[in-house]
C-alpha cells in the first residue's frame, strides 16, 4: 500500500499543480478542447486544488499504511479512479472529445483502481491498526 500512496501522491500533486497553474494546457492535452468560459477555468482550478489535496493526503499517509485511515483513503481513491475512468470514457465515446493524454489517463486510472482493489484485498487479510 505504501507504494500506491507514494505513486498517487506524486501523480495527483503534479496534475493538481498543473491544473492550478496552466489549466488550459492540461485540458487541451487531456480532452483536446479549451476552457472557453471563465467558469470552466474556475472549475479546473478547484479540481487542481482537490487533486493537490489528495496528493498531500497520500503523501502523509504513506508511512501509516496499516491504519484504518489509510484503508479509508485507499477506498476513496478507488471511488475516484473508477469515477475518473467512467467520466473520461464518456468524454471520449459520448462527447467525441480526444486529446493526446485521454487514453493514457483512462488506462492510468484503471490501473490505479485495480491497484487500490489489490491493496484493500490484501489489507483485509491482515489486521488493521488504530491510531491513538
Predicted features and spans:
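Juxtamembrane helix-break-helix junctions at the cytosolic face
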Residues: 58-71, 92-94
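Core segments of alpha-helical transmembrane spans in multipass integral membrane proteins
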Residues: 14-19, 39-62, 75-86
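Membrane-embedded alpha-helical segments of multi-pass transporters/permeases
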Residues: 20, 59, 89, 114-120
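Membrane-helix boundary connector in multi-pass membrane proteins
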Residues: 86-104, 120-121
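Membrane-helix boundary elements
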Residues: 3, 15-42
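Cytosolic juxtamembrane helix and N-cap/initiation of the first transmembrane helix
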Residues: 1-12
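Non-cytosolic membrane-interface motifs at loop->transmembrane helix junctions
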Residues: 33-41, 72-73, 96-107
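Membrane-water interface at the C-terminal end of transmembrane alpha helices
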Residues: 111-132
